[in-house]
A protein has these predicted regions:
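Tandem repeat scaffolds
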Residues: 156, 164-286
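Hydrophobic scaffolds flanking metal-cofactor catalytic centers in soluble metalloenzymes
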Residues: 1-119, 123-142, 147-150, 154-165
Length: 287
């Protein structure tokens, strides 16, 4: 469930739309190739995406759906076979959703505490994998929302097992909480339920997030400097890429430290904090 851009037909650069914003320098409609996409399906500005106004591209991750659709579902590129382009671009986000579920299920199966439900997790993984191998027409007929709901039941049970063994405040429930800009520096968030929480711009420097459930948490611009996320569950590369961190940030072994994170150590940590939804005064934006 890892992206292999060398075996993809540049699907994220073509199939998906984006609007001119802080994340993208230009607007692009779905189905129209990004002007930076080369003939060999590589990005012409990959090494300088962030400096060129495309940080959104460095955040995105397809969970390996790109190469699956390119090499398995179709086998020929949208350039070589233009008649398949529209369908290929429709299939891509479907497979991407399914591959995200495979990522979660694979992680859940790797955890010793989920041994009591391993058989159910394995069955769900195999069913999801079977769906990804379908023909284009079959994939477009998949009820992704219904399948996600079914898988989510197992992910919730996984979360409960992990958080119960985290050794912290496992009862801390911040599911879907508005923690935008929250001051959580040094906070003990071990075993916390942060599913779908809005942590945009939150100060999580030095926070202990071991055993926390972070599925769907919005970490855009959150400061993870010195934070400990080892043992957290359902954290994805997309979330990590969207956050800020440093050399002292501890990540789960399955995730990669983003290249745009500084390689410097943080200063002395502040005293442990408590969860607070008090937001800092807004700063005046430049430009």
């Amino acid at each position: 469930m890892r992206a292999d851009c060398a075996n993809c037909f540049g699907l994220c650069c073509v199939a998906l739309p984006f609007a001119a914003s802080a994340d993208f320098a230009i607007s692009k409609d779905a189905g129209r190739p990004c002007p930076n996409l080369r003939d060999d399906f590589r990005c012409g500005i990959h090494a300088r995406l962030r400096d060129s106004g495309f940080p959104g591209c460095t955040v995105y991750d397809c969970f390996g759906a790109g190469q699956k659709v390119s090499q398995v579902t179709f086998g020929r590129s949208w350039r070589d076979d233009p008649a398949t382009a529209a369908q290929m671009f429709e299939v891509f986000p479907v497979v991407r959703h399914l591959h995200e579920l495979l990522w979660y299920l694979d992680e859940a199966m790797s955890l010793p505490v989920t041994r009591p439900i391993h058989a159910e997790l394995r069955a769900a993984f195999e069913e999801t994998e079977r769906l990804t191998m379908g023909a284009p027409g079959d994939l477009l007929g998949v009820d992704v929302a219904a399948h996600r709901d079914k898988v989510n039941t197992l992910l919730l049970r996984t979360s409960e097992l992990v958080r119960a063994s985290a050794g912290g405040r496992a009862s801390a429930d911040h599911r879907g909480a508005d923690l935008i800009g929250a001051r959580l520096r040094g906070a003990d968030l071990r075993g916390a339920n942060l599913r779908g929480a809005y942590l945009i711009g939150a100060d999580l420097r030095g926070a202990d997030l071991r055993g926390a459930d972070l599925i769907g948490a919005d970490l855009r611009g959150a400061d993870l400097g010195g934070a400990d996320l080892t043992g957290s569950v359902f954290l994805t590369q997309v979330q990590v890429n969207a956050a800020r961190g440093d050399a002292a940030t501890k990540l789960p072994p399955a995730l990669t430290r983003p290249a745009h994170w500084p390689a410097t150590q943080p200063g002395p940590a502040a005293a442990p904090g408590r969860v607070s939804t008090r937001r800092p005064r807004p700063r005046r934006r430049r430009g």
